[in-house]
């Protein structure tokens, strides 16, 4: 069917049914509805493709709205005719409180970077040496500056969308991604013999849309968003899909990473992108070039760099991929990146502006950071109004004054940085930046350790630090207390309920329910999450305490070596240095932390509250390895969080939603109808609480 068919059919339906967006569509009989509903879906899909992918609409917005409204009215009248790939299902009214974690079928790895022609020639040389081939064909395409996503299609249907996460596991944001009209809800992969397919992509916001959003925010006296990438990433993680649909998001796909059956994987990257393009996805196909040698690659990268400012979207470089997919296994991967692809990074953008003032912020461990307030300047489509000056030494080295004209640069398209001062433009009333001697938050005297560059506030009760410490203690890698983010931490601190991390474990339901933002359910959820966090173990507690230089890896080594927090408290610096990767600075920092009486008091209060301060193994056994559990309803034996910990200690994983990866749905009292219905539809085994407990007992 060609364009003329779709255009003529649209006009025919508009005329036959007298459709208009400001009129109620006619109510059809079910027989009439069945006859026309698939035609309407095909028409809307076609017009979405013309508008969002090709940017070449062939009907007016009013005509589009009219046929969309007609389809919606039919589905409202006959809900049994709704299908998962219907275009009306892009927006769900459900508001999620959390995003379940999902494992990517293929890891979402980073790319190694190249910055000049010599780097690109070295990449070409390595590819030829590893492959044993004299001639290599490359695909070169823009490197979009957005939020990474993976899309999963099964039997032609879009069944799951996820964020990049840590590369192995991301967050399930399917409902939000369904609102993006450049993501087809159905694509005819079965025509290519493909049953299951995972695609990589990027969610972006065009420069003009980003500029308009920020202009509207500033008109309402709201702070502008920092850059399109952060706004796109934040948008796909909004809790309400109805809010996501209001954002001007575009999704582009640029890589097929997994296919079943595997022998139906396209033979070339160029062929894979063309297939996606032909199936209605927005891809880099029209901007992609097939290059016969590395000189053609270099020439195309330079050409695209020269036109980057005229592009409607932000790019920070080009991606070069070996075209022959059969070479990918042979070329292999490093620990973090494929050897068959590389990114060519463009030179950073620069602009000049004036330093209006300098303020001093207090970090979680007390570091004082000078932040320059700038005369707003546009740099690569982003308005820059502030920039970190890092520390006192940086200010002295650059000889930065208030009212100086400075050259700033956006490295990697995101982080603004002061490159130099234009000293010839320094006005007579320019003032040197005076570093404070006392904390701007609590007034305590600042200290600087020998050999270090940072001035620090060492008052553990400093208000600016306390809120950040609470947030860090509750973070995912620490105690993982769901619902205790920065806003709630600030609320609890302002209400004088939590002045110290140990206070978290003495909160009561009655304390929370009287606060703004807390209803009975959210208050109980937080109390349950706090209770569940008590069993996280020593490594997570150590990391959560926020000891300077003690990250999660070091915390795990300390826990593994000492087993109990009181052994660490008693350890000497010399003892601590016996542990791998712990040197003088880290050992001294640990001793200083445990040498403060208020920190010892905090640990005692954590212990009295029942927080486990001994080492726990991540999994007691692997009897349930490979299984995934989902819980619905109320369990009488324990909270859901505790139940999750029980199965995870036996090697299983958990999720908040039922998918084809689910092994068991554990059903408690008053279960959710949606999870039960989906489990039944997918053939997932459901078990009662009693069966669940027997399964745990048998697995110990």
Swiss-Prot record:
DNA damage among keywords: yes
Keyword DNA repair part of the UniProt annotation: yes
Active-site residue list: 143
Family annotation (InterPro entries): BRCT_dom, BRCT_dom_sf, DisA/LigA_HHH, DNA_ligase, DNAligase_adenylation, DNAligase_N, Hlx-hairpin-Hlx_DNA-bd_motif, NA-bd_OB-fold
A cellular component annotation (GO) from this entry: cytosol
GO biological process, one term: DNA replication
PROSITE patterns: BRCT
Ranges for domain BRCT: 619-700
Keywords, sorted A to Z: DNA damage, DNA repair, DNA replication, Ligase, Magnesium, Manganese, Metal-binding, NAD, Zinc
Binding annotation for Zn(2+): 439, 442, 457, 462
CDD domains (alphabetical): BRCT_DNA_ligase_like (cd17748), LIGANc (cd00114)
Name by which UniProt lists this protein: DNA ligase
Organism annotation: Hydrogenobaculum sp. (strain Y04AAS1)
Gene name of this polypeptide: ligA
């Amino acid at each position: 069917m060609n364009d003329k068919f779709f255009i003529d059919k649209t006009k025919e339906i508009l005329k036959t049914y007298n459709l208009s967006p400001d009129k109620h569509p006619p109510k059809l009989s079910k027989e009439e509805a069945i006859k026309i509903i698939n035609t309407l879906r095909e028409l809307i899909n076609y017009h979405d493709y013309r508008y969002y992918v090709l940017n070449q609409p062939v009907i007016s917005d009013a005509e589009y709205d009219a046929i969309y409204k007609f389809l919606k009215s039919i589905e409202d009248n006959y809900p049994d005719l709704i299908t998962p790939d219907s275009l009306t299902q892009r927006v769900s009214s459900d508001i999620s409180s959390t995003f379940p974690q999902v494992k990517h079928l293929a890891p979402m790895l980073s790319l190694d970077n190249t910055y000049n022609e010599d780097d690109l020639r070295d990449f070409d040389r390595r590819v030829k040496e590893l492959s044993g081939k004299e001639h290599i064909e490359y695909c070169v395409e823009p490197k979009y500056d957005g939020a990474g996503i993976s899309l999963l299609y099964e039997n032609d249907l879009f069944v799951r969308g996820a964020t990049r996460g840590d590369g192995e596991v991301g967050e399930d944001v399917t409902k939000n991604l369904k609102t993006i009209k450049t993501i087809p809800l159905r694509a005819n992969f079965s025509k290519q013999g493909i049953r299951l397919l995972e695609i990589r992509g990027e969610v972006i916001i065009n420069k003009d849309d980003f500029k308009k959003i920020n202009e509207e925010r500033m008109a309402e006296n709201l702070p502008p968003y920092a850059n399109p990438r952060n706004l796109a990433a934040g948008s796909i993680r909004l809790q309400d899909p109805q809010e996501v649909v209001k954002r001007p998001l575009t999704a582009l796909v640029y890589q097929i990473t997994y296919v079943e059956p595997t022998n139906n994987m396209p033979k070339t990257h160029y062929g894979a992108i063309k297939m996606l393009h032909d199936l209605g996805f927005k891809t880099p196909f029209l901007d992609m070039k097939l290059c016969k040698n590395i000189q053609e690659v270099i020439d195309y990268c330079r050409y695209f760099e020269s036109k980057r400012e005229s592009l409607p979207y932000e790019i920070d470089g080009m991606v070069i991929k070996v075209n022959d997919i059969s070479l990918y296994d042979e070329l292999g991967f490093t620990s973090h990146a494929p050897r068959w692809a590389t990114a060519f990074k463009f030179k950073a953008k620069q602009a000049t502006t004036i330093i209006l003032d300098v303020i001093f912020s207090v970090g979680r461990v007390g570091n004082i950071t000078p932040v320059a307030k700038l005369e707003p300047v546009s740099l690569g489509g982003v308005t820059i109004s502030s920039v970190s000056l890092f520390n006192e030494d940086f200010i002295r080295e650059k000889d930065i004054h208030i009212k100086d004209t400075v050259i700033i640069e956006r490295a990697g398209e995101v982080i603004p940085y002061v490159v130099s001062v234009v000293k010839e433009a320094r006005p007579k009333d320019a003032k040197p930046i005076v570093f404070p001697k006392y904390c701007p938050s609590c007034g305590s005297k600042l200290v600087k350790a020998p050999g270090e560059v940072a001035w620090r506030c060492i008052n553990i009760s400093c208000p600016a630090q306390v809120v950040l410490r609470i947030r860090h203690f509750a973070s995912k890698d620490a105690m993982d207390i769901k619902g205790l983010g920065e806003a709630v931490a600030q609320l609890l601190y302002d209400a004088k309920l939590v002045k110290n991390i140990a206070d978290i474990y003495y909160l009561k339901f009655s304390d929370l329910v009287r606060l703004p933002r807390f209803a009975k359910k959210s208050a109980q959820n937080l109390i349950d999450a706090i209770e569940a966090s008590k069993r996280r173990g020593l490594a997570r507690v150590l990391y959560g305490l926020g000891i300077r230089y003690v990250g999660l890896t070091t915390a795990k080594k300390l826990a593994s070596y000492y087993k109990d927090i009181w052994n660490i408290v008693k350890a000497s610096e010399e003892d601590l240095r016996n542990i791998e990767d712990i040197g003088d600075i880290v050992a001294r920092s640990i001793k200083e932390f445990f040498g403060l009486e208020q920190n010892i008091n905090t640990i005692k209060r954590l212990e009295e509250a029942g927080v486990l301060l001994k080492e726990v193994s991540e999994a007691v056994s692997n009897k349930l390895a490979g299984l995934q559990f989902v819980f619905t309803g109320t369990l009488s034996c324990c909270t859901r969080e505790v139940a999750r910990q029980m199965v995870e200690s036996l090697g299983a994983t958990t999720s908040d939603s039922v998918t084809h990866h689910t092994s068991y749905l554990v059903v408690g009292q008053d279960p959710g109808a949606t999870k039960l219905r989906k489990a039944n539809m997918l053939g997932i085994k459901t078990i009662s609480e009693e069966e669940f407990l027997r399964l745990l007992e048998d697995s110990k």
